[in-house]
């Protein structure tokens, strides 16, 4: 049985991804930020819910080492923790950018740095980041400056990881969705047809494919999932 780490597992996307991987027979280690969030998950013998502050580099490194000791091999990580901020250049401060980098990049990097070394030793592993269309297209990101800049770092990190892992069965992939069909997005954009958005369950299936053996021959570091947006 493969063991996967899913961060931000109780969010709209995280819940769908956790369900998809459990349904496909994986052992899932799911992270949340508070003890009370454990109640969001139904009991499952293949689910291990852990509370960890991924913004704390020392605590995250210790957490990853404890997982390796417990499960011996971590086959994949899906790093879903993140957050959104609106603001164009004139309204975005350096502090705004730093906050978004801490949330969208550092939480992923703190996991990746120790976990990638484990995967390099095993010559096998998958790391999946969640990017965003505004980080790839200026027309989409001009009013999301801090958010787009913070997410753009994930694309470069994936490039570095893939270069270092060249010749090994290790890949880093950034999946860049457009708007997700979530209750919050439906409420904030009531005049938009949600049929054009990306369903979390559909994105979860794509993430499972990326991690699975079916994806072994593919070396594509960026996958765009825009639906009809």
What are these regions (language model features)?
Residues 126-166:
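Catalytic loop of short-chain dehydrogenase/reductase
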Residues 10, 14-18:
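N-terminal Rossmann NAD(P)H-binding glycine-rich loop of SDR-like oxidoreductase domains
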Residues 78-87:
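Conserved NAD(P)H cofactor-binding loop of Rossmann-fold oxidoreductase domains
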Residues 43-58:
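Rossmann-fold cofactor-recognition segment
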Residues 88-90, 96-101:
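Substrate-binding pocket helix/loop in short-chain dehydrogenase/reductase
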Residues 73-74, 119-132, 167-171, 221:
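Active-site loop of short-chain dehydrogenase/reductase
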Residues 167-170, 174-175, 182, 191-229:
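C-terminal helical subdomain
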